[in-house]
Each structure stands twice: as C-alpha cells, then as structure tokens.
Amino acid sequence: MKSDKKNTKNSAFLTASFLLFCSGVAALIYQVIWIKQLGLVVGVDVYAITTGVSGFFAGLAIGSAVFGRLADRSPKPLRIYIGLEIGIALLGITATLMLAWAPAWFVALQSSTGVLAWALPFMLVAIPATLMGGTLPPLLAALKPEDASVGRMTGQLYAANTAGAIVGALIT
C-alpha cells in the first residue's frame, strides 16, 4: 500500500516536471519572438531587449506572487494551472499579433505621451508573462509535498522549467 502511494506521488511529480519543462520551452519561444518584434516596434535592439526582459521578469514575479497565494487557498489548484495555461496560449498569441501592429501605435503614443509610450510594449510582454509566472505554484500545491521536502521539490520543478527554457531558447 505504501509503495502504491509512493508510485502515485512519483508519477504526479514526473508529470508536473514534464508540464513545467514544456511550459519553459513555450515561455522562451514567446520571449525570443517578442524581443525580436520589439526591435521592430521601438527601433533599437538594446531598448527592445531591455523592455522585453523587464516586462517578462516583472510578469513572472507578479504571477508567482498572485497565483501562489491563490493556489495555496484553492481546494483544486490544478484548475488554476489549467486556466493559466489556456490563458498563456490565448494571451501569448494575442500579444504576438498585437506586437506586429504596435509600431504605429508606439509612434503615435510617443509623439503624444513621450516616455509613457513605453508602457505599451512593456505591458504586451508583462501581461502574458504574469500568467507564466503563476504556473509553478499551483502544480506544487497540487503535489502537496511534506514540509521537509518543499524546498527540494520546488527546486526540482524550477530546474525542469529552466531546462525547458534552455531548450526553447536554443530552438528559436
């Protein structure tokens, strides 16, 4: 009986690791595409990279904090995870399409609002990245690790996500 429970936990952990690996691949593919598109929006690669990376990491941090709290309180954290992944797909595609149209909007905003125009490309990246940042906490909450193994399990899940991010960056 104890062995069956351990096998179920191992299977759930491997599934969560695989999901986070795939999520990492997709996240970095989006990030690389968005940064390339931002170069066309703002016209200077260094500003595009700065805006893209800043928006991406701000979104990741906000998403982890917000959805971590929600996952801790939720009786069904996997539903949160599924909703986040669906939202990432929808917002990721939307952001990619909007970035294709953003150069004209950015120029018009920059003429009228100056530095505030930078909020447009920043937010186009930060909003979907917020959902990306929220994916690990619900999976961790669903696994319900014992207190003694929370740190180790969190690190292993982040490692799976990071490995996916490396693959995503390499194939883009």
Task: Please place each PLM-identified region on the residue numbering.
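Alpha-helical transmembrane segments of multi-pass membrane proteins
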Residues: 1-172
